[in-house]
Amino acid sequence: MTEKTPDDVFKLAKDEKVEYVDVRFCDLPGIMQHFTIPASAFDKSVFDDGLAFDGSSIRGFQSIHESDMLLLPDPETARIDPFRAAKTLNINFFVHDPFTLEPYSRDPRNIARKAENYLISTGIADTAYFGAEAEFYIFDSVSFDSRANGSFYEVDAISGWWNTGAATEADGSPNRGYKVRHKGGYFPVAPNDQYVDLRDKMLTNLINSGFILEKGHHEVGSGGQAEINYQFNSLLHAADDMQLYKYIIKNTAWQNGKTVTFMPKPLFGDNGSGMHCHQSLWKDGAPLMYDETGYAGLSDTARHYIGGLLHHAPSLLAFTNPTVNSYKRLVPGYEAPINLVYSQRNRSACVRIPITGSNPKAKRLEFRSPDSSGNPYLAFSAMLMAGLDGIKNKIEPQAPVDKDLYELPPEEAASIPQTPTQLSDVIDRLEADHEYLTEGGVFTNDLIETWISFKRENEIEPVNIRPHPYEFALYYDV
């Protein structure tokens, strides 16, 4: 990302004849919030004095009696919006206390910034790079409801295998076949891949917004699962990239009559959508993860970083897999990484070491468990803090496992730890194991307590008290 100053932003706004500035910040669960001001009101005072807003209406922020908050712009995030009818400049802001002007401790972007500063303070490294690969589904329609006397959801995509018997295509013409089999969507060309033109539009919008792309393709799942990969970035910017990526993917689909979801598991019986996170540490422009004598070319630093990720995974997943739906994905049989080990070839391991040859700059690890249902600022920061704890305390991971973990004999499989099976478990683990997150004041106890309460009250308990439709298939005639 090119460094920008306030003057650069003003010049961009003038050159592009910007009419409006969209003020953006992130709530605690991970949804970007915004309001719009006219370009004429966007001047130096915004950078000096900020913009006030009511924080009591933002999830996870202030209570009503202390609602006033302040926003200060981050000039490096200025981008022209590709979707607005009027020429609009989008800018991400940091949240501050309006009286002390201190960064707000529950602002996710501020937490990511603190994580980067803490990394530097340790002397271990000065830059953490993250490359996140977020999968998603493209549907034609979605409907759902949850009432006292009924509950349902239904998604549809004309390319879904369940539509082999449909009379017509989406345009009303006769069914012409070429539906994608469950778990059969990885790489077939058109007409099996019916989304190539839409993905091309997504690619174009991403490129025009500054992304350096690697590839886009249909993913394994039927019904339009897809993935588009782009270049890594430093932690805070990588989280900004993920939020912008999701905004562009969703709105490109919306403008073309489709709807996108990043839910980890929207379909029963097919692959879920993950957010594999490639990570590496650098210092003074030099990579720290490579040692030609180590397993898979890993340095001691890299191995201990992995040790920290795996050791803290049961609590770390509270930020990297933070929804009830996350644990519908982390089950055997769907290429999901549920085994808390590392490997240079096994994709069912939580940590995989990509084959990068002898290039030290390319050496990295891939944490495969995360999904994109949460807050990338918190997720990336939490992963870094777990890895740094591993380095500081020289946490050794369990020996690498290069066998097919699903084919191990029972006695050997029993020695392989696995990810927790439900959100309530990882929230309990976070309550017991979070000191690694509060090192250097990166995460505060208040933030962690707020996260735990929010998840229990707004997600875990509401799901637990509602009858599930499948329970009627099991128990109605008891």
Swiss-Prot record:
PROSITE patterns: GLNA_1, GLNA_ADENYLATION, GLNA_ATP, GS_BETA_GRASP, GS_CATALYTIC. GO terms for molecular function: ATP binding; fibronectin binding; glutamine synthetase activity; magnesium ion binding; zymogen binding. It comes from the Bacteria. ATP binds at E214, Y230, Q231, F232, H278, Q279, S280, R347, R352, K361. Its cofactor is Mg(2+). It catalyses: L-glutamate + NH4(+) + ATP = L-glutamine + ADP + phosphate + H(+). L-glutamate binds at N271, G272, R329, E335, R347, R368. It is found in: Cytoplasm. Residues 108-478 form the GS catalytic domain. Mg(2+) 1 binds at E133, H276, E366. Induction: Repressed by phosphorothioate modified antisense oligodeoxyribonucleotides (PS-ODNs), which acts against the mRNA of glutamine synthetase. Belongs to the glutamine synthetase family. This is Glutamine synthetase. It comes from Mycobacterium tuberculosis (strain ATCC 25618 / H37Rv). The gene is glnA1.
